[in-house]
From Swiss-Prot:
PANTHER family noted in UniProt: HOMEOBOX PROTEIN (PTHR24327), HOMEOBOX PROTEIN DLX-3 (PTHR24327:SF28)
CDD domains named among the record's database cross-references: homeodomain
Lineage: Eukaryota, Metazoa, Chordata, Craniata, Vertebrata
Subunit details: Heterodimer with MEIS1. Interacts with IPO7; the interaction facilitates nuclear translocation of DLX3 in dental papilla cells.
Pfam families xref list: DLL_N (PF12413), Homeodomain (PF00046)
Record's protein name: Homeobox protein DLX-3
Ranges annotated as DNA-binding: 129-188
Family: Belongs to the distal-less homeobox family.
Keywords of the record: Activator, Cytoplasm, Developmental protein, DNA-binding, Homeobox, Nucleus, Transcription, Transcription regulation
Origin: domain of life: Eukaryota
Function per UniProt: Transcriptional activator. Activates transcription of GNRHR, via binding to the downstream activin regulatory element (DARE) in the gene promoter.
Coiled coil: none
Cellular location(s): Nucleus; Cytoplasm
Ranges for region Disordered: 195-287
Length: 287
């Protein structure tokens, strides 16, 4: 054992001394030595003997080099580890499994947290929850009552205006009028309609109610038909027409005032004939 170690040590010392002598000779001459081939074989032989016991792969093995750095603490994080990709894949798979697990658990929870607010289960049957009733003030009730006496049916603009005046919604006004009409019809059938809501005082009910026969009878007797009026008595026959006897006749009055001009302004027989129902005028009666 010690003999082999001594031989290796002596060979190493011989190599060192020969290399020193070779470098000293090369410094003296500016050119390379002539025996280049022999020197190459001389250097290659001891190198082969020295590195024969150690394979080439062990000196350049990256894993061995990596573990040496791990011992010194320079690469403690393991960034250059060949198994880093597997650890990353495992962590990613764990993250994927973690993300997929709560998803099916959230679906039934979301369904349970959002039930319908207006439907309640009573004895296994769905029952709709009624909304709270609207409480009207005395001022609102008085205004609605006065408007109901005028008209039992409101148009859309009228309903919107009334709701804005009373501070109510249009739905509340519509529901109040519907309830009031149903109550009024029930009282009307039972004969308990108050005087203020009688058909004579309400325009809308007057149109819907049947006509009163007493009103039609009194109107027919009080206002007789014009066809039943007696004819006026016939006028007595006179020789002179009516327009001559009437002193207010403007044409006759002007003719009497201007006597000498009677022949210059003869009367129009067509208009005079239509004006009087009697016989045609006689021009000789004027004189």
């Amino acid at each position: 054992m010690s003999g082999s170690f001594d031989r290796k040590l002596s060979s190493i010392l011989t190599d060192i001394s020969s290399s020193l002598s070779c470098h000293a000779g090369s410094k003296d001459s500016p050119t390379l030595p002539e025996s280049t081939v022999t020197d190459l074989g001389y250097y290659s032989a001891p190198q082969h003997d020295y590195y024969s016991g150690q394979p080439y792969g062990q000196t350049v093995n990256p894993y061995t080099y990596h573990h040496q750095f791990n011992l010194n603490g320079l690469a403690g994080t393991g960034a250059y580890s060949p198994k880093s990709e597997y650890t990353y894949g495992g962590s990613y798979r764990q993250y994927g499994a973690y993300r997929e697990q709560p998803l099916p658990a959230q679906d039934p929870v979301s369904v349970k947290e959002e039930p319908e607010a207006e439907v309640r289960m009573v004895n296994g049957k769905p029952k709709k929850v009624r909304k709270p009733r609207t409480i009207y003030s005395s001022y609102q009730l008085a205004a609605l009552q006065r408007r109901f006496q005028k008209a039992q049916y409101l148009a859309l603009p009228e309903r919107a205006e009334l709701a804005a005046q009373l501070g109510l919604t249009q739905t509340q006004v519509k529901i109040w009028f519907q309830n009031r009409r149903s109550k009024f019809k029930k009282l009307y059938k039972n004969g308990e309609v108050p005087l203020e809501h009688s058909p004579n005082n309400s325009d809308s009910m007057a149109c819907n109610s049947p006509p009163s026969p007493a009103l039609w009878d009194t109107s027919s007797h009080s206002t007789p038909a014009p066809a039943r009026n007696p004819l006026p008595p016939p006028l007595p026959y006179s020789a002179s027409p009516n327009y001559l006897d009437d002193p207010t006749n403007s044409w006759y009055h002007t003719q009497n005032l201007s006597g000498p001009h009677l022949q210059q302004q003869p009367p129009q027989p067509a208009t005079l004939h239509h004006a009087s129902p009697g016989p045609p005028p006689n021009p000789g009666a004027v004189y």
